[in-house]
Amino acid sequence: MFDLNITHEVNELLKQVRKGLRNKGYKESKSRTNRYIGTIHLNYITEYFIKGNLVFEIERDLSNSTITTRLHYNGKEHKEIRLADILSLA
C-alpha cells in the first residue's frame, strides 16, 4: 500500500486487523489529510471501522511513521488501544 516507512511486521499486523474487522462485520471508511501548518507537513491516513456504536480508528502519520489506534463508543473517544488488541476487543 502506501505505508512507506512503517516496518514490514507492522504492515502485516495492519493487514490482519483490517481483514479480521471486515470478517466481523465492521464497515470501513477512510480519510486522508495532507496539509502544511507553517513549515510542518501533516500527512495522515485515518481508517474507521464501524459497527453499531463501536468505532475503531487507526490513524497513520506518514510524516513520522507513527500509528495511533483509538476505540470510540457512542460517538465519544473511549481510549487509545494497542493495535494488537483490536481484534480481541471487536
What are these model-predicted stretches?
Residues 28-66:
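Amphipathic, interaction-prone secondary-structure segments
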Residues 16, 25, 29, 78-81:
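Intrinsic disorder/low-complexity segments enriched in polar/small residues
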Residues 14-16, 37, 46, 74:
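Short, flexible coil/linker segments at or flanking structured domains
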